Amino acid sequence: MKRSEIDRSKLSPMMKHYVELKDKYEDTIILYRLGDFYEMFFEDAEEVAHALELTLTGKSAGLDERVPMCGIPHHAAEVYIDKLIKKGYKVAICEQLEDPKTAKGIVKRDIVEVISSGTVINTNSLNEKENNYIGCLYDFSYGFVLTYSDITTGEVYSELLTNNTDDVIYKILSLDIKELIVNELINKVLLSKIRSLKIPVTIQNELLNDKYQNIYQNISDARIVNSIKLLLYYLDVLQKRNLSHFQEVVIKEKEQYLEMDIHTKRNLELTECLRTKERTYSLLWLLDNTKTAMGSRKLKYFIENPLLDINKINKRYDIVSKLLEEFILAEELRNDLYEVYDLERLCGKLSFGSANGKDLLQLKASLKVLPSIKEKLEKLGFYEKITTMSDLYDLLEKSIYEEPPNTIKEGYLIKDGYSSELDELKDLSRGGKDFISRFETEERERTGIKGLKVGFNKVFGYYIEISKSYLNMVTDDMGYIRKQTLANCERFINPILKEKEDLILSSEDKIINLEYNLFIEIRDKCKEYIPELQRTAKVISEIDVLSSFALVSEKYNYIRPIITNGNEIKVLNSRHPVVERVLKGEEYVPNDIVMDNNTDILLITGPNMAGKSTYMRQLGIIAIMAQIGCFVPAEEATLPIFDKIFTRIGASDDLVSGESTFMVEMMEASRAIKYATRNSLILFDELGRGTATFDGMSLAQAILEYVANKIKCKTLFSTHYHELTDMEKTIPNLKNKHVSAVEENGNITFLHKVKDGSVDKSYGINVAKLAGLPDEVIDRASGILNIYENKEKKTDTIIQTTLPLNFDEKKSEVEEEVKNIDILNITPIEAINILSKLREKVK
């Protein structure tokens, strides 16, 4: 049955109200509160019953047939809502706004909140280590503004983007934005691409009034302000969110942070492993020894936004150095940080009015350690201050029970002694319950019925229960009124018991209502501290990150780099921080990376799997570590400030446009040489390999010449085109490097040491042998290689290389494993692990 086909004049008042709400919230699933259940009707019911595997039933609504219906218990609603959100639905919560017991006529109901993938506030459904961003993309004809916010923390960011739609897409993907609001001017091609990524999109033009002007009052750019107000309208008006905890908008300006596109972040495996898409084996995984959820999120932000300001970087170094010097103090500080809960998201709960008793206890526990943290920060000379908010701690200490329930409408929230009125009601209630206990004893003595019990349930209230074996002792003069007969007993009431019941239940209702009102007062008082709590959260998250840097630096022997305004690179005995940690039973081979004022390009040759890609990634990661304020894995390090990093490492097809590997290579090369400056870093791994040999070699040489003569930025360029190494003779700012290997009796040993000069062999067949390819294949490949190397006639070569191959069929476990390796997408870390396992199998 479809809503559009029914005769609305016949609907019951309740169902008519539901249909009117559904007309307003057409794009949502409405959960309509009826007693202890949220119910769905018509198409919503059919869709949700299928999506969540619920029983589809029907409900009388005044029509000739029952309307489709399904329902979920209100106490378990969060679980079901979470499932719906993950399936891409929006959910509108329609609550009862008055007590059904006292309502006259139909109970008042209305939508109180709308939940979508970008506006989830249930922290149990979110990853505490990551932000959950909702974004607003504002198209102003010749560019875009992207404003995005994590509504659970109140953080809001805004940045101007070019009109390059691919750049916009990659920015959205890089931020992992869960939901997007766009204005009606939006580029239709871009909109189609966004929707193809399964990101929910809402188109609207309405801007919010100046209700939350305080968060953007210092911004003069009307485009940015309009983008912010577009997002605020969606959150405030359409989703009915209280945004009083929203912080001042941070404008992300290119002059402040090192620029990296999504390809660079993925190629360098900054926040997730390229192959598994998980944190493990990423730089974030290595550096994250934070003690708080806020610190973990802040660390991710640091890694994705390295600084350009040397003074700010050195301030971070100074704190890390101090933490290493004061190691006992640092450990005590980390112990204190462990006691701090997620203050940012607690502020969100206070603002939304969803904080319960347990949330306030978490706030109290966090406030308790602030004096100790403040004292330690002062000893460390930390550049930010915190306040302890002792008056708020005192309020929570004297008011909230140590073990409150999950809801705030059950009572047992407020401590004795906080409210004299509440204490009086509790005394009355306890006195009544004491009476019940005495009454049971007295009745046993008066009647002689030893099996007499006094019980309680919500249907009958208090009752007297007598088992069947004692029923013959019940007489009329006892004054018992039979109420219920069960299999093994009967239940009675009497006037005295009912009188006390009314008194007890009346006082308990009053207690629950008073506790609720007192709790709301206390929560509202906490809400007044949100700005102060957010400032404190910012300081704690930053010191947590720097404390993690100190711990990792001490543990893995990192050193403080020297950052200069020049362009020289001198990193001695450097290591790849992640690779060295995952090598099992093998010693990591460190390498120097030295590029003086006269050297802009290192052209790197060497065997496959020898470590060229690792060497290149190593410099990129060390540069990023240095610019986020972390010490680096080396014996000595002097580095310039890089404004941008461009990479092309590994081979993969485009995520969005479906372009081929070679096309993506050229697009990324184009982006690098178009936008790179003298202060940028370019890392190109075997550029040009995706096409014919001479095409690829020509392009590689032309790109190298352009970088050397026009851009003159620091560049690491690996290649198998050995002819390119002759460029060292004609380009003075290019130097050859090679990754050394030793060949003996047809076997190759990787030394993983980068040395001056070039090599003239790729050792591809040796690597194939090491990987476990069958001997027949290796022998045949060696023969063909000899033909090419001996420069036989072309026709003869073709004949020779197309002779029928009579390999014996032979399958082995190693062969099957080698076949299954995804060579194009494998990372150096994974390759090392796979080769190690294969080598063990063929020993």
Say what each PLM segment does.
Residues F42-A45, D221, K291, S296-F302, ...:
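ATPase nucleotide-binding head domains, primarily ABC-like/P-loop NTPase cores
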Residues N356, K837-K841:
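Short, small/acidic-rich helices and loops at N termini and domain boundaries
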Residues M1-K322, N335-Y338, D342-S351, A355-T441, ...:
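Charged catalytic and DNA/RNA-contacting regions of genome-maintenance
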Residues C94, S117-L126, N242, E378-G381, ...:
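Active-site phosphate-binding and catalytic loops of NTP-dependent enzymes
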Residues F352, N356, S366-V369, D416-G417, ...:
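Charged, surface-exposed helical/loop "interaction arms" that form contiguous linear patches used
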Residues L486-D524:
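Extended, charged coiled-coil "arm/hinge" scaffolds of SMC/Rad50-like chromosome-maintenance ATPases
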Residues E206-K211, E259, L274, A365-D434, ...:
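Amphipathic heptad-repeat alpha-helical coiled-coil/stalk segments that mediate oligomerization
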Residues K59-C70, Y157, Y212-N218, E269-T271, ...:
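Short hinge/gating elements
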